[in-house]
């Protein structure tokens, strides 16, 4: 399949969140955030593990109180994936979770306090080799910037970010990444473009408060897709009012669609029409459900008739072309003598895909499967 990637990624420095490299050409990391009460340790640990199971590289956890900080200590002890502590208002919470092995601190300088408090957090992070994310958000800009610009603008987001980048620079701290999120696509995109020209640190991408599963996925795909196609971005989070597991799936789907990072199966499926020889929609939905555990990069085309089916199958790892009672099967673009009974397509195709994944895995170094 045509898979040339014309994207030239923006050059940046590298930091590490736990053992996950960020920036300087490292694979773009996909992260999410728990939506449980952090003080409910069991529920939070369960959600983190669920996120890890679908491929999350990093998970952010809100730590709003000292009680939550104590819970974070227990959560960290029971999980393996790198954890970011999300800190607002009380800088002392950042100091506390640093004692408990946090992998990264996310602070919003607009509400964390004065420069001396930021300095305390930075000195602690330096001592413990913990990176920081400066998280600028259009909904929580500093009062003086709102007075100056009257509303969130790309320039306001940039000025807020640079104000706090300058603080870290003065403190000789360079282990950080930056985000300038907004809920409006054009506002966020332009802010990131401006920021990308000003600093060399990694950028964390996101359209904040994007919306529900459908609308938020679309908004995030448009905004992040624009930036990623320009080579901007080193980590990302899809902010959805939905199960956080869906954020990881959508994140990987965006990267997969741009051929930046392939994880799992890329299904190529027709929307179906009266020419379909089998139930395309239910077939695809069921295969997506059954094969969520397959992380091997693979293109699978499922087309309901012979109009476009053979052409798509020629450039797929596995292809299915609808036929009368039995459908044609392609392997690596070659039509096979074997045909699938239309009443048993899901089981037959699942078996072929899993077998193909095993073959591909034998050709791909294990460490590359998660790239």
Curated annotation (Swiss-Prot):
Its EC number is 1.17.7.3. [4Fe-4S] cluster binds at residues 270, 273, 305, 312. Binds 1 [4Fe-4S] cluster. Converts 2C-methyl-D-erythritol 2,4-cyclodiphosphate (ME-2,4cPP) into 1-hydroxy-2-methyl-2-(E)-butenyl 4-diphosphate. It catalyses: (2E)-4-hydroxy-3-methylbut-2-enyl diphosphate + oxidized [flavodoxin] + H2O + 2 H(+) = 2-C-methyl-D-erythritol 2,4-cyclic diphosphate + reduced [flavodoxin]. InterPro entries: Dihydropteroate_synth-like_sf (IPR011005), IspG_bac (IPR016425), IspG_bac-typ (IPR004588), NO2/SO3_Rdtase_4Fe4S_sf (IPR045854). Its cofactor is [4Fe-4S] cluster. Belongs to the IspG family. One of its GO terms (biological process) is isopentenyl diphosphate biosynthetic process, methylerythritol 4-phosphate pathway. Keywords: 4Fe-4S, Iron, Iron-sulfur, Isoprene biosynthesis, Metal-binding, Oxidoreductase. One of its GO terms (molecular function) is 4 iron, 4 sulfur cluster binding. Pathway: Isoprenoid biosynthesis; isopentenyl diphosphate biosynthesis via DXP pathway; isopentenyl diphosphate from 1-deoxy-D-xylulose 5-phosphate: step 5/6. It holds the Pfam family GcpE. It comes from the Bacteria. NCBIfam families: ispG_gcpE (TIGR00612), PRK00366.1 (NF001540). The gene is ispG. This is 4-hydroxy-3-methylbut-2-en-1-yl diphosphate synthase (flavodoxin).
């Amino acid at each position: 399949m045509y898979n040339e990637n014309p994207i030239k990624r923006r050059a940046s420095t590298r930091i590490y969140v736990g053992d996950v490299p960020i920036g300087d050409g490292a694979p773009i990391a996909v992260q999410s955030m728990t939506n449980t009460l952090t003080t409910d340790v069991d529920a939070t640990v369960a959600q983190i593990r669920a996120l890890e199971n679908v491929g999350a590289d990093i998970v952010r956890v809100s730590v709003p109180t000292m009680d939550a900080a104590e819970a974070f200590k227990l959560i960290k002890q029971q999980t393996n994936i790198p954890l970011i502590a999300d800190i607002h208002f009380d800088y002392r919470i950042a100091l506390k979770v640093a004692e408990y092995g946090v992998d990264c601190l996310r602070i919003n300088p607009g509400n964390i306090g004065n420069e001396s408090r930021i300095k305390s957090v930075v000195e602690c992070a330096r001592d413990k080799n913990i990176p920081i994310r400066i998280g600028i958000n259009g909904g929580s800009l500093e009062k003086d910037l709102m007075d100056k610009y009257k509303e969130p603008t790309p320039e306001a987001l940039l000025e807020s970010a640079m104000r706090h980048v300058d603080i870290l620079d003065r403190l000789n701290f360079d282990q950080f990444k930056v985000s300038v999120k907004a809920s409006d696509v054009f506002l966020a995109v332009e802010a990131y473009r401006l920021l990308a020209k000003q600093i060399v640190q990694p950028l964390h991408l996101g359209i904040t408060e994007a919306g529900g599963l459908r609308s938020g996925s679309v908004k995030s795909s448009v905004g992040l897709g624009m930036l990623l196609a320009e080579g901007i971005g080193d980590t990302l989070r899809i902010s959805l009012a939905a199960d956080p597991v869906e954020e990881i799936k959508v994140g990987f789907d965006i990267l997969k669609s741009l051929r930046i990072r392939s994880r799992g199966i890329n299904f190529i499926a027709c929307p179906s029409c009266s020419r379909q020889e089998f139930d395309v929609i239910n077939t695809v939905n069921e295969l997506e459900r059954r094969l969520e555990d397959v992380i091997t990069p693979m293109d699978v085309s499922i087309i309901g008739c012979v109009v476009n089916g053979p052409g798509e199958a020629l450039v797929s790892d596995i292809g299915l072309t609808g036929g009368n009672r039995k459908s044609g099967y392609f392997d690596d673009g070659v039509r096979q003598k074997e045909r699938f009974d239309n009443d048993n397509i899901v089981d037959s195709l699942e078996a072929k895909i899993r077998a193909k994944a095993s073959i591909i895995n034998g050709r791909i170094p294990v460490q590359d499967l998660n790239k």
